[in-house]
């Protein structure tokens, strides 16, 4: 579901008066195909703006939780009071969507307008619109919206298609005479990947491989998340000795990723990570180090400070191939605790606590970078339905082989 509301502020007898009206969502049928078909982003970012009959105004934007979803708020002001009859919102999503996402026409001219606030309310179980509506995407880089699915018999990373308000994919189970009682569907947005993510099997577990076991690899995925805490389950089946370079999780960003850092950072074993706007905490787990956890503070300009340094680079942290690991980040007040556990062996791999320089918000974008430089492992996500917020289990009653359509419908109000 997606809908919008426009608030005009006018001056009436030296008093501020607000006029609110629902708007019309337009071009969703143009945005959805762009989300599903974009393979690379533009070379520059166009600032969001509102076009009116009185001229264009640049806007700032923010995102906040609202009911079971989020509201994206675009705000702009006129240099002098203006008379408004129509307006169009251009979010410049994905740096390439240069059409209005919403429009509004008033039955009479509204005089003396000083500012416009345009709220777009989104409740999206796929997470795709949460990732697409804000414009700050790393420029000139790979982009992939995809559906990772499994049914207990097989798994696949599926290309998405779109038609009008529909997003769809086709899942093929080619096994013979096996029951299909469910399909787990997980929508992901990947950017700046060196090698395309893929569906694999590690041991007896279906897995989504983020990077292969080779040098010079990284992959970024991100999502909007309504918690101070973070959990991720992962595994690997092959790699060097010692292993590298693990993951960096940047939490509390106010936007999707805006840049990829590849330079050295004080206290980190490896500085390759994507980050967004706003005050954020980046947690590195790199088993190439004997103390494999570092915690750093970042903002939209880049690195700010090191709160916890990793140590013993090159000595390695013992991990067992094919085991399942849990990376868990919990926050209590300003204390952050990072723990990595081998749940197969029932042992703790690493655990550290650190005091944060600010109390983190209860929502924001989580930006995860998996990376390999000179040493490596095929870092992969497992048990995704247990921890990833944009996961949907669809009950079915079939026997393989089957070709099964998976469809998401986006409604406007």
Curated annotation (Swiss-Prot):
Membrane topology: Single-pass membrane protein
Subcellular location: Host membrane
Keyword Cytoplasm: no
Transmembrane segments: 25-47
Keyword Transmembrane helix among record annotations: yes
Keyword annotations of the record: Host membrane, Membrane, Transmembrane, Transmembrane helix
Domain of life from the UniProt record: Viruses
Gene Ontology, cellular component aspect: host cell membrane; membrane
Protein name, entry field: Uncharacterized protein ORF413
Source species: Acidianus filamentous virus 2 (isolate Italy/Pozzuoli) (AFV-2)
């Amino acid at each position: 579901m997606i809908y919008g509301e426009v608030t005009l502020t006018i001056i009436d007898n030296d008093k501020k008066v607000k006029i609110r009206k629902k708007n019309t969502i337009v071009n969703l049928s143009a945005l959805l195909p762009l989300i599903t078909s974009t393979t690379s982003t533009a070379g520059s970012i166009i600032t969001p703006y509102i076009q009116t009959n009185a001229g264009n105004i640049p806007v700032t934007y923010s995102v906040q939780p609202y009911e079971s979803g989020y509201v994206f708020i675009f705000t702009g002001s006129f240099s002098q009071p203006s008379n408004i009859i129509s307006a169009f919102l251009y979010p410049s999503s994905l740096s390439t969507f240069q059409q209005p996402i919403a429009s509004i026409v008033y039955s009479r001219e509204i005089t003396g307008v000083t500012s416009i606030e345009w709220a777009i309310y989104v409740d999206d179980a796929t997470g795709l619109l949460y990732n697409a509506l804000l414009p700050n995407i790393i420029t000139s880089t790979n982009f992939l919206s995809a559906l990772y699915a499994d049914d207990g018999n097989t798994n696949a990373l599926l290309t998405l298609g779109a038609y009008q308000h529909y997003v769809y994919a086709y899942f093929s189970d080619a096994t013979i005479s096996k029951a299909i009682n469910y399909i787990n569907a997980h929508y992901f947005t990947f950017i700046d990947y060196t090698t395309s993510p893929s569906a694999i099997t590690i041991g007896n577990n279906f897995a989504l491989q983020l990077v292969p076991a080779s040098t010079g690899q990284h992959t970024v995925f991100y999502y909007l998340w309504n918690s101070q805490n973070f959990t991720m389950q992962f595994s690997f089946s092959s790699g060097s000795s010692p292993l590298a370079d693990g993951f960096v999780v940047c939490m509390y960003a106010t936007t999707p990723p805006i840049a990829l850092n590849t330079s050295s950072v004080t206290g980190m074993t490896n500085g390759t990570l994507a980050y967004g706007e706003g005050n954020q905490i980046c947690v590195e787990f790199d088993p190439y180090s004997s103390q494999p956890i570092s915690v750093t503070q970042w903002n939209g300009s880049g690195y700010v400070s090191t709160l916890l340094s990793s140590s013993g680079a090159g000595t390695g942290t013992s991990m067992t191939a094919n085991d399942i690991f849990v990376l868990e980040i919990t926050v209590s007040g300003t204390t952050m605790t990072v723990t990595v556990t081998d749940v197969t062996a029932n042992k703790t791999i690493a655990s550290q606590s650190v005091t944060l320089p600010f109390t983190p918000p209860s929502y924001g974008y989580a930006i995860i970078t998996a990376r390999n430089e000179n040493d490596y492992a095929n870092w992969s996500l497992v048990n995704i339905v247990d921890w990833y917020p944009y996961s949907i289990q669809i009950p079915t009653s079939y026997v393989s082989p089957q070709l099964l359509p998976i469809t998401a419908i986006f409604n406007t109000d």
